[in-house]
Amino acid sequence: IRCFAKFVYDNEIVKKNEFSVETDAGIKYIKLDIGALGAIEYLKVNMEKVDFKGKNIPCTIEKENILEEEIMIGNKKVIFSSVLMGVPHATIFVENFDEYDVNETGSLMEKVDIFPEKTNVNFAKVTADDTIMIKTWERGAGRTLGCGTGCCATAALAHKLGKIKKDKIKLLAEGGELFIEIGEDYEITMSGKAETICHGEFLK
């Protein structure tokens, strides 16, 4: 969503620094921090509320919330928590990332039958009282260097489980950092940068 917002602003499709984007996961409200030279320095997105209800994720475990549940993935026991952040997310909190092969465990868990619509899988390590390192396996796409909804879901779960008590949390993904603010009833605001890395043209 941040990359899309940057694209439409940079290409003058949208000329205001505040606008909304209608997505399959609802309407997202964007605010751009524009620098002195007219370039975007930061983007803030209202991601709406996290949905903790298991039936809405959807997850077939018959509990109100899917928090710190245990499942066997391959031959390894996995403890995970899950929410709907526009799309399904399962987060595994680890002490060290070498506890799991992110690609193997992520691929298997994406398709496990308790998630009838499949799930994104996040591996998260709390490194400070306001900081989380995260690696993400995205459903249908595989390993990704960054996932905005995954960062939002993981920050909300860390807060809900008491792993982090602060309302402003830094997420360190492999592709960069995001800042997540947790508001009333777990309404989430995501802030971060977006950078253009290349331009291309489709030829007929």
Question: Residue spans of the language-model regions?
Answer:
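Active-site proximal loop and beta-alpha junction motif in alpha/beta enzyme cores
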Residues: 2-145, 155-204
